[in-house]
Amino acid sequence: MKQFENKVAVITGAASGFGKAFAAYGATLGMKLVLADIQQDALDATVSELKSRGTEVIGVRTDVSLAREVQTLADITMSTFGTVNLLFNNAGVGAGGFVWENTEKDWEWVLGVNLNSVIHGVRIFTPLMLDAAARDAAYEAHIVNTASMSGLVNAPTMGVYNVSKHAVVSLSETLYHDLGLVTDQVHCSVLCPYFVPTGFNQSRRNRPASLANAQTPTRSQQVAQAMSDKAVTSARISADEIAQQTYQAMREGDFYIYSHPEAMDPVKQRFEQLLARCNPGDPFAGHPELRRNLARTVRG
């Protein structure tokens, strides 16, 4: 996709972090925006901010883990703008700790937001895009699914999150191949960011009460949260920079989008180990002190 002016973008997780940055940058390109988020006050504030700049934008409170609410999001988009050109499946949450200590509710919450939301978005919006492409040879569309570097490597104490993001990478790669069989007008990308100061580490603020854990967090869960807090808050690349990279990747037709190319060594190491049938290597190999500190801390 080369031109973005007057195109319609649907963005989930749009009230903060990457989603808000996608919206803000899209607004500078003259796009029409449909913003979805579960946090109503933050969503309203983002919509108001963009409207004050002259952007044509609406907000739709959406629990993206629920198919019926994503369907409502699509219905409102079509009734308001009549089309959709960009879909950012971006909403995401996290829960850490040893995989045997994660509860059923941890899995339900993280997979619901991180994976099921992408499934719902692809299943509901892709047919709308393909139908528009069949009716108009000039129509263009693009889907961006936000995964993570955790969709390419498996760090300890991040099992639930790792599983969800590996699944998003797999879904996105399959979507790429499937679209290639039927159209030249609808494309997709997968964004694999490293740590970025987005407030993602505080995603538990939007965890539904029905999926809250009754028990006190375990030591490994507390350590994982502390590591996430430190990594996110100390990150140097901003969400705004990632948004610009993402739009540029769409212009160039890139599928894989990496926020930190210098962090790809563990990915290369992992695939070399797979090919050599080696046991999994240390994802912290470049920073051995991290593994030592983690082991010492979780053991108490």
For the regions a language model picked out, list residue spans one by one:
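The beta1-alpha1 cofactor-binding region of Rossmann-like NAD(H)/NADP(H)-dependent oxidoreductases
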Residues: 40-41, 60-72, 104
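SDR active-site lid
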Residues: 181-260
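Canonical Rossmann dinucleotide-binding motif of NAD(H)/NADP(H)-dependent dehydrogenases/reductases
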Residues: 2-34
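Conserved glycine-rich Rossmann-like NAD(P)H-binding loop of the short-chain dehydrogenase/reductase
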Residues: 29-45
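Substrate-binding pocket helix/loop in short-chain dehydrogenase/reductase
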Residues: 98-99, 103-111
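Active-site helix of classical SDR
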Residues: 122, 164
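Residue(s) in the substrate-gating loop at a strand-loop-helix junction
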Residues: 148
